[in-house]
Structures are given as C-alpha cells and as structure tokens.
C-alpha cells in the first residue's frame, strides 16, 4: 500500500528518469537551428573540435547536447531520417549505461548512433554488438554513412576476416560485429605472443543490440577455443549399441522439467552385464560411466529436428530460441560425440579447452555497457543483479493500437493446428498478412503441411540464411502474405505493411556490377566502363524502386483497411519475453495489427510446467474433444507457469555465473600476468581496468612495461620459489628441524647452485643467502647477453604460463563435472568448487614460477646471437601451437544438468595453499600478497 501511494505521489523510477530526459531533449532541440545552418564540410571540423575539448579535460556529459544535435542533423542529411524526441531519450539512457526498451519499429538502430558518436569522441572506441553477421554488416554500412559524414571511421568484424583486417576494424572509431566474434577475438588475443598482434583495443563501451537475446538467452553458452585430444572414439560406439535396449521407467527415469535422466538399479545391472563391467561406479570405470550418462542423455533428452539436425553427415545444433542452425558449435563433455554415435555419423574427437569465457563475464569487462531491445522489462531483475544494468522503458513515438486477443486452448495438438489453419485461411481471404510463430523447425513444417492441404500459399522461414531471412521477413506485411517462422527468426528487420519497396527492387534487379580485378597485359585498370555500368544500374534501381513504392503504398492502404499484420503464436514459449517479441512484430509505429496464441494441452509448457492448476481449470470449465476454451483465468494460469519457468531458468543462469566467476577471476589474473610479460620491451602502452568488487566502478590505468620491470618480475619469481623451498625444508625460524641435505638438493635441482649453509642462523638469513647467489648468476647472464637473453626468457615465461594454464583448465573441467556429488556428503558443491579451484590456481601459479626459474638457471646460451636464435625458435614453436588450436567454437550448453553423472574429480589439495609473496592477495585488493595480508602475517 505504501509503495503504491509513493508511486502515485512521486511516480515510478522510470517516470522520474523520463521527466529528467525530457528536459535534456529540450536543450538538444534548441541547438537544431544552429546545426541546420552548418555546411556539409563543417561537420568534420565540429567533430575535431569536440575531440580536442575532450583531450583538454571536458567530459562527455558536457558535450552530450551538441553531439546529439549534430548527429541528428547528419542523419537527416545523409540517410533522410531525423531522430524523434523519444529516440533522443533512448540515446541518453544508453549513454548512461542502461538498457533502453524500445518497441519493435521504433528505430533502435538509428537511436544507437547518438551515444555511439558521443562516446567515440573519446578516441577509445565503441563496439556495437548484434546477433548475426548480416545485421552487423547492414548496420555498419547503413549507419557508417552518417559516421563518415561526421568524420568518424567505421569497421565491421566478420567471421571471414583475417587478423590484419580485424585489427583495422577494431582501430576504427566505431566497430560493429556479432557477439561471438568479439568474445572469440578476446580469447584469441590472449593466446598471442606479441602485443602488436592483438586485434582488440581496450574494452571501452559496448552497445548490445537485442541485449536480452545475447545476455540472457545465450548466457548459458560459454565461448570455448579448443584443441583436439588423442582419445579413441570406440567407447561411444560400444555404449551406443546397448542404450536403445533400455526400457523407460523400468531402466531409467526421465525428468523433462529439469532436463535430467538417471539410471535405476535395474538399468545399472542390465548395462553392467551388456558392457561386461563389474561395477559401473567403481573408480576405475568412471570414464565408462561418463560415456553411459552422455549416451543416455543423447537418446532421451535430445531430439532430431528439434535440438539438432543431421546435415552433410554432421550433427548441427539448432538454436532453441531462434531455430537457426549453428554449424561449428558442438556440445561439450562428450555429448556431441554421443549424439553422433546415435545418428550413425562420423564421430569427431573430443576437444580439450585452451581458452574459455562466458558472455556474462566477457561483457562485464567493458568499462561501460548498454543495451537495446523491444522486450527487457520482464528480465529487469536479472539485468540489475548480474550486469548492474537498469532497464528504462521508452515511450512509443505514436500510441500503439495493436489488439492482443485472449489465448485459445484445445485438448490436442492436431485440433490446435486445424484451428490455426482455419484462422489463417479466413485472414488470407480478407487480404490480411499473417506471421505464424513456432517454437521449432519441426513445428514450422507441421503448420506448413496443414496450410498446404488447404491450398494456402505461404513462406516457411527455417532460418538457414540471414540475408534471405531478412528479405522474406521484410515482405511479411504484403497483402495476403502468410509467413511461418521460428519465434525470433528475422529479428532486426522491420515488417512494413504493404511491403518494402527497396528490398523488392533489389530482388528484381540483382546485385550491382562487380568491379574489374585485373587489366589485360598488365595495363592499368580502366574503370570508365565499370563506372558507366554502375551509374546505369543505380538509375535503373531508382526507377524500379519508385514504381514499386507506388505499388506498396496502394497495398499499404489495403492492408491497413484489412486490420494490419496479424500474429499467430502456435505455442507459448518458456519465457514471456519471447512471446512479447513475437507479438511486437505487429503494430509498429502506430500501425494496426493483432495477435493471438493457439495452445493445446499437449504443448511442452502445458504438459511439463502447467501444473495441476491448469488441468483443474480445464476440468471445471468442462473441456470436451474438439472444444476450445478461452478464459482470462486460463491466460493468468499460463502466465503463472511461465513465471515459474523464468525463475527456474534465472536460477540456472545465476548458478552458472557463480561457478564461472571462480574461473573468471583466475582467467583475468593469468591474462593480466601474460600481458605484463608480453608488454616488456614492446613499447606498446598496457591499458588495464580494475573493478571495485563492491561498487563495480572501473578505474582505467595505462603504462609502458620496460625490460627493467620484467627483470623485477623474474627476481620476484625467484624470491617466491626460494620461500617455497625454505617453507618445505626449513619450516622453523631457527636451524632446529631444518633438513639441510634435502634443502641443498632442492637448491641444486631448481637453481643449479652448489651451496653451503654453514653460519646461517635463521630462516630470513637462509632465504637472503640463496637469493643473492641466484641473483648474481642471473645478473651476470643478463649483462653478458643483454636484450636477446631477456627476449628468450620472455618467450620461456609465456610458454610455461600457457602450458600450465591449459592443464589447469582441464583440471577445473574435471572438478566441475564431479563437484555436484559433494552434495551427497552434506557439503555445498559451490563452496567446495571455489575452495578447491582457488587451491589449484595458487598451486599452478607456484608451478609456473618454479618451472620458469628452473629453466632460467639451467640454460647457458653460448652467445648473444644464440640466445636470439633460441628466442626466435621458441616464438615460432608457440605460434605453430596456437595455429593448431581449433578455430573458436562455442559449446551449446554450459549449465550443469541436475542428473549429470560425474567424471573423476581432482583430489583435494592441502587445506590452505601457499600463496606466493608476489602473487595477488586472496582478499581481492589487487595488491601483492607481501604488501597486503602477507605483511601482517609476517609481523606475527
């Protein structure tokens, strides 16, 4: 009651923010007359002036009004589109690092130009992230014209680009690209051996288009770069032969709600006999148990033509949200191989993880993050908790008039599709365009077959090609058009009532003439004929488009009269947001339109999550075969089921993030160390962002790492190794209890030094004695061989980091797979994972230093030139290893299924790991341990 009263008195937070934004819009509008008076050539000089002001210390906020006003005028002149006031508001919210919820057709692409231009003035780059290559290319070309007019450079990161082309794209003021490309480039950069070869700059500001799709729907999809292992694939075939003989409910139990499957005692006994295994749960058979678990999941949980398709002898994953095929992606942990065995296609070797990051943690690394979508408000809590992002709802430019009708529910799926086909037939006769949304490729084909029987012409969009997908969706608003699509296919493309004249003209004309690539007999290229061809093509295109505009204008009026675009949903999705996205395709910019969902009791949501409440409602309402039920109670009950599923999925994503946060901290520490080593002597500024864990505020630092800094890093590593040795063999302060013989042997093996410890009275003297001897040897070699020796050590350090980090990733994979079983021992798996993961990481850091120092002290270059040759050899070897890594691939499912069977977990390490004095302090302060908690412990 109090909350309701306060909202009435002072308004909601969204209303208050809108009120503030309207005042700013008035200031932008005041500058419009001045901007209209500018000559075309003045725009670049205005951009240069604002850039200089930022260099002189003026803030981006101070320049917002000018930047927005000049961008609006540039867009008006170049592409004939002037930003509406609501788009200015959206741009302001994006600049503040919020998510702007803007309904479909309100011009998100144009809105993004405002904060993009403003933030690009800083010179640190802006990334505009889209859901596919087609949209990235389209928006970069379309909006790039505006940016170029303003004197800004624009790049586009596409899958087919090489490293040099990627560098150029990232060096641009504004870079467009697909989310996977940005994430994989980050991982690949952190596997390189020269800072100059990095393609990405600092992660300054990102605007994520369709932010809900990327940060929520794909949050369970980690990006993984991997290399093949040598494991045999025979076990997959062997296990696959026995799984089909298992009987449901008798040999295994299936839980569709939690997507888990588990063997019964009968099933275990049956499999042990058929596989010739004494006890599947014997530690020696843990690998076989893992294969059984994955094969069982492959046969029971993963369905052909729903979760994947078989194409050209390969299993290709189908995106559960868009219905798009995702070639190149593979399920992890042997699941993909189990499905390949099930389908009888060639089984590819499993891959070992070389580098991995989740979308959640990649995008949280940006100094500032913002997003746009038509549907975010239902997930506002998740955006706030995980990404620290506020959702701001932007009002529409014109009042929406779409009519959303009550759901209708049938008893069987067949009755439902009959009703859908009958409804489409009626709408089609009236000339009203219809967009039918389905949840899978298989369901699209079912709807198509019902329409075919009735002789209704239609287009089926199975999302195989983004360009064709966009063209078909663009024409879905034509008179009488019927388009069947998975729920989100063609997202990012406006559906214009009456059709899109430009797309129609391009379809009838074909592509423009290709430029000549060579001239005969080595003569210089003569482009006169080509330019004439292009001019003729452009003229013909303009004429064709003009004729088609007349046609589409007439059609638009007819479609308006018929009621606009009508959306038919054939099933409720697990998320209300995805349903809202489908509905949002109709009624853009104040157009008429309507929507209705047709459901059945056999739909997955109703069957798995509907609960007894919906079934009870049906019985009370007296549902008979062939009868349809339409009631507000039913719609509320279905929405309640969706809310429960959304909560369940949010918990899964949150759980995944909590596990991934452990790896994220380790990854950032290793990559930071790696960059410090790489930066030594490179002359390239090292830019880093440190985040306060409480406020999440990021601070930027920039420095150059010299060879002197690298020498200090080496000496710090020596110091830590010495402390570790003395902790092991001389644990007491006094000489009592020291194992002198073992210590001498340890110093000999590690430092290649024969040492006598007579006269050393305590542990501090002992450490100093060893350190001075090792430092003397190191400095002598450094003075003799100079920079070549440093470069040799640099590549050795990198090789050691990469080798042990790869082993650590494998160990963490094994730990993660088995950690769920700790719950049976009354231990919290998450806390156990954090504890053991941290112990393993500290041990890995110690091993990196120990192995590097051992190599350093045992190597003896013959000359400076031999040190240089050895450094070059190691660099070539490392580069070759990197090339062998599989081109970035993404696993399709990163969540822990509740019924997954564990692989062998790594044994627990010591209860309290030895933290190196020069390691980052475990408290998270970012300072070295010896200068933080290590200092207080030393004084005790």
UniProtKB/Swiss-Prot annotation:
Report the InterPro entries cross-referenced here.
Answer: Helicase_ATP-bd, Helicase_C-like, P-loop_NTPase, SEC_C_motif, SecA, SecA_CS, SecA_DEAD, SecA_motor_DEAD
Q: Which GO terms describe its biological process?
A: intracellular protein transmembrane transport; protein import; protein targeting; protein transport by the Sec complex
Q: Which reaction does it catalyse?
A: ATP + H2O + cellular proteinSide 1 = ADP + phosphate + cellular proteinSide 2
Cofactor: binding details: May bind 1 zinc ion per subunit.
- Enumerate the NCBIfam families for this protein: PRK12904.1, secA
Instruction: Give the family this protein belongs to, as stated in its UniProt record.
Output: Belongs to the SecA family.
Relate the assembly described in the record.
Monomer and homodimer. Part of the essential Sec protein translocation apparatus which comprises SecA, SecYEG and auxiliary proteins SecDF-YajC and YidC.
The name of this protein is Protein translocase subunit SecA
State the organism of origin.
Answer: Myxococcus xanthus (strain DK1622)
Task: Specify the taxonomic lineage.
Answer: Bacteria, Pseudomonadati, Myxococcota, Myxococcia, Myxococcales
């Amino acid at each position: 009651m109090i909350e309701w009263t306060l909202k009435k008195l002072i308004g909601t937070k969204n209303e208050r923010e809108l009120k503030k934004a309207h005042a700013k819009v008035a200031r932008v509008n005041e500058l419009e007359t001045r901007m209209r008076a500018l000559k075309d050539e003045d725009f670049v000089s205005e951009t240069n002036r604002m850039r200089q002001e930022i260099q002189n210390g003026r803030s981006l906020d101070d320049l917002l009004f000018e930047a927005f006003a000049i961008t609006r005028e540039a867009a008006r002149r170049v592409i004939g589109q002037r930003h509406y006031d609501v788009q200015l508001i959206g741009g302001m919210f994006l600049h503040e690092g919020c998510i702007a919820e803007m309904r479909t057709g309100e011009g998100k692409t144009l809105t993004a130009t405002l904060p993009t231009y403003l933030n690009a003035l800083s010179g640190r780059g802006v990334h505009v992230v889209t859901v596919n290559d087609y949209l990235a290319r389209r928006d970069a070309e379309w909006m790039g014209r505006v940016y170029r007019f303003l004197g800004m450079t624009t790049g586009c990161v596409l899958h087919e680009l090489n490293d040099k082309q990627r560098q150029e794209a990232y060096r641009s003021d504004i870079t467009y690209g697909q989310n996977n490309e940005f994430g994989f480039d980050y991982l690949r950069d952190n596997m390189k051996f020269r800072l100059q070869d990095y393609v990405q700059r600092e992660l300054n500001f990102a605007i994520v288009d369709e932010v809900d799709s990327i940060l929520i729907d794909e949050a369970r999809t980690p990006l993984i770069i991997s290399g093949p292992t040598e494991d045999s694939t025979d076990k997959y075939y062997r296990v696959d032969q026995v799984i089909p003989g298992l009987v449901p409910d008798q040999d295994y139990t299936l839980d569709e709600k939690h997507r888990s499957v588990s063997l019964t005692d009968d099933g275990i006994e049956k499999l042990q006999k058929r596989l010739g295994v004494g006890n599947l749960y014997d530690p020696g058979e843990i690998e076989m148990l893992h294969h059984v678990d994955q094969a069982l999941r492959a046969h029971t949980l993963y369905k052909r033509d729903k979760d994947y398709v078989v194409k050209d002898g390969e299993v290709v994953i189908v995106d559960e949200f868009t219905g798009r095929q995702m070639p190149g992606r593979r399920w992890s942990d042997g699941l993909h191989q189990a499905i390949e065995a099930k389908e009888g296609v060639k089984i590819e070797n499993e891959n070992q993880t070389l580098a991995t990051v989740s979308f959640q943690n990649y995008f949280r690394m940006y100094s500032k993050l913002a997003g746009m979508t038509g549907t975010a408000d239902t997930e506002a809590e998740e955006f706030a908790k995980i990404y620290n992002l506020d959702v701001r709802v932007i009002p529409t430019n014109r009042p929406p008039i779409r009519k959303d009708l009550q759901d209708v529910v049938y008893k069987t799926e067949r009755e439902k599709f009959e009703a859908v086909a009958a409804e489409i037939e009626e709408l089609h006769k009236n000339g009203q365009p219809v967009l039918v949304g389905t949840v899978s490729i298989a369901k699209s084909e079912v709807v198509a077959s019902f329409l075919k029987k009735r002789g209704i012409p239609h287009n089926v969009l199975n999302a195989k090609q983004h360009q064709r997908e966009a063209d078909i969706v663009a024409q879905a608003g034509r008179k009488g058009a019927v388009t069947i699509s998975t729920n989100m296919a063609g997202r990012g493309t406006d559906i214009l009532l009456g059709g899109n004249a430009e797309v129609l003209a391009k379809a009838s004309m074909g592509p423009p003439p290709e430029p000549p690539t060579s001239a005969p007999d080595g003569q210089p290229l003569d482009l006169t004929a080509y330019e004439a061809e292009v001019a003729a093509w452009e003229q013909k295109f303009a004429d064709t488009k003009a004729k088609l505009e007349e046609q589409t204008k007439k059609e638009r009026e007819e479609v308006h009269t018929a009621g606009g675009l009508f959306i038919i949903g054939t099933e409720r999705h697990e998320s209300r947001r995805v349903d809202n996205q489908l509905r949002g395709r109709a009624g853009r910019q104040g157009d008429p339109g309507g929507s209705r969902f047709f459901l059945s009791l056999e739909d997955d949501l109703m069957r798995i999550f509907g609960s007894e409440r919906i079934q009870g409602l049906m019985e009370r309402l007296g549902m008979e075969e062939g009868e349809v039920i339409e009631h507000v109670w039913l719609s509320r009950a279905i929405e309640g089921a969706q809310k429960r599923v959304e909560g369940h999925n949010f918990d899964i994503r949150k759980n995944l993030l909590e596990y991934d946060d452990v790896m994220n901290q380790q990854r950032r520490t290793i990559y930071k160390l790696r960059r410090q080593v790489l930066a030594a002597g490179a002359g390239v500024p090292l830019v880093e962002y440190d985040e306060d864990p409480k406020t999440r505020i990021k601070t930027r630092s920039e420095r150059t790492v010299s060879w002197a800094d690298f020498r200090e890093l080496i000496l710090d590593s020596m110091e830590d190794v010495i402390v570790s040795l003395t902790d092991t063999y001389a644990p007491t302060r006094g000489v009592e209890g020291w194992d002198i013989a073992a210590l001498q042997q340890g110093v000999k093996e590690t430092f290649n030094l024969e040492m006598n410890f007579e006269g050393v009275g305590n542990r501090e003297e002992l450490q100093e004695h060893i350190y001075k001897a090792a430092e003397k040897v190191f400095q002598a070699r450094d003075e003799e061989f100079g920079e070549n020796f440093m470069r040799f050590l640099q590549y050795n350090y990198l090789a050691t980091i990469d080798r042990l980090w790869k082993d650590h990733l494998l160990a963490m994979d094994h730990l993660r797979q088995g950690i769920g079983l700790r719950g049976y021992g009354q231990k919290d798996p998450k806390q156990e994972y954090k504890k053991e993961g941290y112990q393993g990481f500290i041990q890995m850091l110690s091993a990196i230093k120990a192995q590097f120092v051992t190599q350093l002290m045992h190597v003896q270059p013959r000359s400076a030139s031999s040190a240089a040759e050895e450094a070059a050899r190691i660099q070539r070897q490392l580069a070759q290893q990197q090339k062998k890594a599989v081109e970035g691939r993404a696993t399709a499912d990163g969540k822990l299924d509740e019924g997954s069977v564990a692989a062998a977990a790594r044994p627990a390490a010591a209860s309290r790991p030895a933290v190196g004095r020069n390691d980052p302090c475990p408290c998270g302060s970012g300072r070295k341990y010896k200068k933080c908690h290590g200092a207080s412990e030393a004084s005790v």
